[in-house]
């Protein structure tokens, strides 16, 4: 797909449309083949667009939506009471084929509920899972679930592993190493659902399952795809982001302590800046909702302009790779034994 069309929920997130419009226009400039549909309060979006010079309007359309979903709104209210919300209209553009992906920084629960209702799940998938990249010593790994499913059955963990493996392949990883996050690497460790999931994964043909991985092994790069329930995954993700921010702040403080440390810091500045960029949460912003019949990427509600750009770039890659269809084909093979 040479010219992806991405639908942007312009009203979602903590900062409203200002950051989202700015990030969208930056991506439009950086990717000449990209087309965007900004969904939300049209008059406000047009006003923000007008404040930027040289916008290619041939690749940008504004779709009006009269409602928006608050970050603390119940998913049921978003689903039943707001048929013209920016989030829902953006998803409907994907459902109707007018866009290949949706990106939103809005209410996570509402996005999950609306995505399931508007786009539906792939055959054999009970619930979508949220997946994102986290940095490791050797690069990064894909971690799922990140909070969409707090309690998971063994079957759900199995489905997550299959979907995560396919996503890693679309990102260029050959035979992705898939592991279950656990409190130990021994077979006797873990709760009942993790142990049952391990049995399912060991029997799965075509899946490079390597066993259990502990939290420190995730950061050592021992696996390309790490599977866990949404409670554990969300805690791990937020801890990773907090740790990265803390390390960057401590490094800055260390090299600004006195004249000598500032001189040493100046010499090391290129390497330090590279480390900060590699670890910056904004660079890894964007969690995919896997298992849907369409591409949906969830940005942090508090994402910066560069962070939201990362979420859009993830949507571009997944739409170009036609990820839902690739997942559908692999799932048909992996679930051929009738276990769905």
Swiss-Prot record:
<dbReference type="GO" id="GO:0005737">
    <property type="term" value="C:cytoplasm"/>
</dbReference>
<keyword id="KW-0808">Transferase</keyword>
<comment type="function">
    <text>Catalyzes the reversible formation of acyl-phosphate (acyl-PO(4)) from acyl-[acyl-carrier-protein] (acyl-ACP). This enzyme utilizes acyl-ACP as fatty acyl donor, but not acyl-CoA.</text>
</comment>
<keyword id="KW-0443">Lipid metabolism</keyword>
<dbReference type="InterPro" id="IPR003664">
    <property type="entry name" value="FA_synthesis"/>
</dbReference>
<dbReference type="GO" id="GO:0008654">
    <property type="term" value="P:phospholipid biosynthetic process"/>
</dbReference>
<keyword id="KW-0594">Phospholipid biosynthesis</keyword>
<keyword id="KW-1208">Phospholipid metabolism</keyword>
<keyword id="KW-0963">Cytoplasm</keyword>
<comment type="similarity">
    <text>Belongs to the PlsX family.</text>
</comment>
<dbReference type="GO" id="GO:0043811">
    <property type="term" value="F:phosphate:acyl-[acyl carrier protein] acyltransferase activity"/>
</dbReference>
<dbReference type="InterPro" id="IPR012281">
    <property type="entry name" value="Phospholipid_synth_PlsX-like"/>
</dbReference>
<protein>
    <recommendedName>
        <fullName>Phosphate acyltransferase</fullName>
        <ecNumber>2.3.1.274</ecNumber>
    </recommendedName>
</protein>
<comment type="subunit">
    <text>Homodimer. Probably interacts with PlsY.</text>
</comment>
<dbReference type="GO" id="GO:0006633">
    <property type="term" value="P:fatty acid biosynthetic process"/>
</dbReference>
<comment type="pathway">
    <text>Lipid metabolism; phospholipid metabolism.</text>
</comment>
<keyword id="KW-0444">Lipid biosynthesis</keyword>
<dbReference type="Pfam" id="PF02504">
    <property type="entry name" value="FA_synthesis"/>
</dbReference>
């Amino acid at each position: 797909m040479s010219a992806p069309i991405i639908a942007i929920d312009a009203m979602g997130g903590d900062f409203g449309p200002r950051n989202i419009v700015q990030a969208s226009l930056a991506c439009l400039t950086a990717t000449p083949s990209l087309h965007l549909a900004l969904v939300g309060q049209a008059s406000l979006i047009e006003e923000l667009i007008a404040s930027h010079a040289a916008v290619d309007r041939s690749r940008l359309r504004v779709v009006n939506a009269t409602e928006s979903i608050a970050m603390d709104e119940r998913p049921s209210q978003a689903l039943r009471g707001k048929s013209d919300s920016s989030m829902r209209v953006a998803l409907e553009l994907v459902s109707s084929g007018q866009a290949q992906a949706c990106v939103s920084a809005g209410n996570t629960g509402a996005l999950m509920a609306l995505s399931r209702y508007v786009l539906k799940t792939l055959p054999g998938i009970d619930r979508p899972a949220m997946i994102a990249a986290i940095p490791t010593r050797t690069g990064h790994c894909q971690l799922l679930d990140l909070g969409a499913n707090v309690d998971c059955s063994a079957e759900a963990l199995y489905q997550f592993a299959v979907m995560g493996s396919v996503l890693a392949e679309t990102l260029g990883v050959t035979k992705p190493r898939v592991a279950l996050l656990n409190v130990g690497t021994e077979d006797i460790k873990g709760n009942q659902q993790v142990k049952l999931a391990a049995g399912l994964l060991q029997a799965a043909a075509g899946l490079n399952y390597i066993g259990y991985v502990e939290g420190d092994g995730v950061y050592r790069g021992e696996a390309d795809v790490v599977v866990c329930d949404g409670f554990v995954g969300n805690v791990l993700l937020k801890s990773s982001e907090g740790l990265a921010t803390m390390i960057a702040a401590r490094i800055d403080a260390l090299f600004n302590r006195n004249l000598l440390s500032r001189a040493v810091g100046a010499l090391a500045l290129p390497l330090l800046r590279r480390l900060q960029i590699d670890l910056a949460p904004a660079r890894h912003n964007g969690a995919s909702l896997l298992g849907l019949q369409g591409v949906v990427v969830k940005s942090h509600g508090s994402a910066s302009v560069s962070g939201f750009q990362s979420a859009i770039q993830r949507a571009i890659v997944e739409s170009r790779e036609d990820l839902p269809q690739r997942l559908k084909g692999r799932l048909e093979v992996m679930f051929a034994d009738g276990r769905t």
